[in-house]
Structures are given as C-alpha cells and as structure tokens.
Swiss-Prot record:
Role: GTP hydrolase that promotes the GTP-dependent binding of aminoacyl-tRNA to the A-site of ribosomes during protein biosynthesis.
Gene Ontology molecular function terms on file: GTP binding; GTPase activity; translation elongation factor activity
Protein name: Elongation factor Tu
Region G2, annotated ranges: 63-67
Amino acid sequence: MAKEKYDRSKPHVNIGTIGHVDHGKTTLTAAITTVLARRLPSAVNQPKDYASIDAAPEERERGITINTAHVEYETEKRHYAHIDAPGHADYVKNMITGAAQMDGAILVVASTDGPMPQTREHILLSRQVGVKHLIVFMNKIDLVDDEELLELVEMEIRDLLSEYDFPGDDLPVIQGSALKALEGDSKYEDIIMELMNTVDEYIPEPERDTEKPLLLPVEDVFSITGRGTVASGRIDRGTVRVNDEIEIVGIKEETQKAVVTGVEMFRKQLDEGLAGDNVGVLLRGVQRDEIERGQVIAKPGSINPHTKFKGEVYILTKEEGGRHTPFFNNYRPQFYFRTTDVTGSIELPAGTEMVMPGDNVTIDVELIHPIAVEQGTTFSIREGGRTVGSGMVTEIEA
C-alpha cells in the first residue's frame, strides 16, 4: 500500500504527558488515541492500546538510551505528535537532552494521590527546559467520592505550579478518568474531547523554525579563489538569503560582521537556504582564517558568545557507556556544542558533594573560550571523545 502523504494543511504541534509514576500517563495517551478514533475517525486517528504504548522502543539520543512512545492523532483543528515515556528516568533524559521537544504538556495527577515527588520534578524540569504551557488532567476521579477532596487536590496542584512560576491560578484543570474513557463510558469520553479542545485552545501554535532568527553552526570552511570564503553546515533555524548581513559568533571574544554573497546546496545556487538545509554560504569580507568550525553564523544581535552559564544535566550510567565513578566540584570535561568541544569547569550546587552516574543535577559551567549559547541550547559532556553526560543551558551568567 502506498504511504499516505503527510498532510500539512493542519498546524502541527508537539505535546506529551508528564507526571508521577502510575498516575495514568500512558492510560491517558491510550484514551486520547482511542476516543479520537471513535469520535473523529480518520487515517491518522488510530486507537493505540496501553500495551503498545508501554512497550516503547529504545532510542539512542546523543549516546543515551531512552524509551519513548511516539503516537500521532488529529483534532478538527490540528495534527499532534504526542510523546509518552514509561519510566521516570526516561522522562528526565527526554527533557534534558531535548530529545522530546514539547510545545506543551499534559500534567497527569491521580486524584487519589494528589501531587507526588515526580509531579514536582516534572514541573521543575518543564520550567527549566522551556515547556511553557501545561494543562492539568486530574485522573481517576471515579475512585474519589468526596467532592471536597477533589477541590483540595486541585488547589494543591495549582499551588505547586505557581511555586515554579507557572500560572497556577489560571491554567486549565480537567477532571476525568482515562480508564473509564478507554472502556467506552461516554461521560468520560466527553471529558477526553473536552481535554483535547482545551489543548487546541490553550497550547499556542509554535513558531516555525524558518520564522526564527538565522542560526547556522559552521562545520567546515574553505576558500574559493577569486570568490572568497565559504562556510558550510546545516541551518539550525531561520533562513539565509543572498545580501543578508550576518554575524559570526563564538570561539573569539569579538563578534564579526559579514555579508552573504551566495548560498549553495548540492553545488546549485539557491535564492535562500531554510532551516534543515545543508548549505555552503559565501561570505564577503571574511578571510579563510577568520572563521572556524564551532562558530555560528547568525542574524545580527540574535545570539551572543558566553563563557558562563547554568545547565541542567543528566550523567550517563556505566551501562550507558558513561563514567564508572562519581565526579566532584571543579571537574573539567569537554562540552560539545553543535560542532565542537570546549573545555569547561563544573561547579556543583551548595551541599552537593559529588555527582553519581545516573544522576541529574543543576551545574554552573565556565568555558575556557566563549561559545554562542542561549537558554535552551543543548550540549553533551565528553571525556576523551566519549559522551558521559547531556544537558541544556537554563540560564546565561556571563
């Protein structure tokens, strides 16, 4: 059977389910796909049962093993890619490595338990890695007879969200039962449809990569006699056109300006290169030795070189190929940003003596030379060429 063409007529949004273990994330994911398949049948809306989502295949993202289930479905307004990770460690890795780029998430809290330690941790991680829009699904309300108890649980969740700078008083809270909806109870199916309408309305459509300011990590540099210097790489975001003014950022203290005089892909001239394209960019006013791998070509003023930042990192276990021993304050590994390694020193949070393989921790990093970074930039931590950790910049310090 011929593969169906991907329908681009509907806006595409990435979401996921987050929350404490056994609060019903996977059951809710199954319920969403199943109820949508019943109510809005389409080629995309196929029911997925708990077992098929729970048996998520292992993926390797930057050397880290992560189990993640990817399902897709559509509402009348949008197409969704939805991620659900079975284990708590999978969530942490997913979010810190940026493997799971979520535009918004559904926080699942069992009404029988209320917020639990991982509820808190997932809210904090969402805040750290820039998932700005959360919707709460209070699950298992069929098991709670007391209306007042539900109100208390909702207040507790809202307070917890406010504590981490989410709009706790204002964000949507939907109460339902994923299991009852999955079993076909129409009252609870209606609630799943209400949840999806809320997701449609409350989670904004993400800015497309092509609409963001240009960022092109330089992978290779060569000169063409008589024409000038060419820098090549894959456009991370934005677009590049002939005659654009750009900046070359990173490695050196000074940011350098240049003008694009040509854009090529597969040896063909282009009017413009778009996010995702592998291009060569011909630059006027730049010598071959003034630009190098590890720098980025960017829209002027959009990104700056920095040496100090806070990061949220996950340290690989021995089984994942990571370190066998903990590390301590002032550990000096390499930080791999986009196309290059830079040595940096790590300062641990007050009260943290050491970091064990398998831990996640907030660290302060100081690099030996500046790199173009911003909040949300991901990196690997390497030792002698092997990955020992993965992280994301959460705050720029200098």
